Amino acid sequence: MNLITTIITITITLSAVLATISFWLPQISPDAEKLSPYECGFDPLGSARLPFSLRFFLIAILFLLFDLEIALLLPLPWGDQLSTPTLTLIWSTAVLALLTLGLIYEWTQGGLEWAE
């Protein structure tokens, strides 16, 4: 048997065993918490029209922006390999300065205050 067939067989077998165990284990000692679906901390059986915290939304957007910043700056060390590393440094500094100015503006406007 060649290597790819062996790996595929092991993968399918392991997946089937783990899926069977995951369906079998909660039924050994059923509990209301085990049988209920989990949706990000929200009650799935409650009203869908509950108010959503705008502060939480703004903090989540800020997190996404700075997460994107990290993703944009990760290839920066490879930018030194280019023919013009100075241009790479200028652009990365501009991105960092723009995001820092945005963070300072958000901070001064009180957008990062969780409770007033």
Curated annotation (Swiss-Prot):
Listed EC numbers: 7.1.1.2
Cited Pfam families: Oxidored_q4
InterPro entries xref list: NADH_UbQ/plastoQ_OxRdtase_su3 (IPR000440), NDAH_ubi_oxred_su3_sf (IPR038430)
Bilayer disposition of the protein: Multi-pass membrane protein
Gene name of the record: MT-ND3
Catalytic activity: a ubiquinone + NADH + 5 H(+)(in) = a ubiquinol + NAD(+) + 4 H(+)(out)
Record's subcellular location: Mitochondrion membrane
Role noted for this protein: Core subunit of the mitochondrial membrane respiratory chain NADH dehydrogenase (Complex I) that is believed to belong to the minimal assembly required for catalysis. Complex I functions in the transfer of electrons from NADH to the respiratory chain. The immediate electron acceptor for the enzyme is believed to be ubiquinone.
Descriptive protein name: NADH-ubiquinone oxidoreductase chain 3
Top-level taxon of the source organism: Eukaryota
Keywords tagged on the record: Electron transport, Membrane, Mitochondrion, NAD, Respiratory chain, Translocase, Transmembrane, Transmembrane helix, Transport, Ubiquinone
GO molecular function: NADH dehydrogenase (ubiquinone) activity
Transmembrane regions listed in the UniProt entry: 3-23, 56-76, 87-107
Similarity comment: family membership: Belongs to the complex I subunit 3 family.
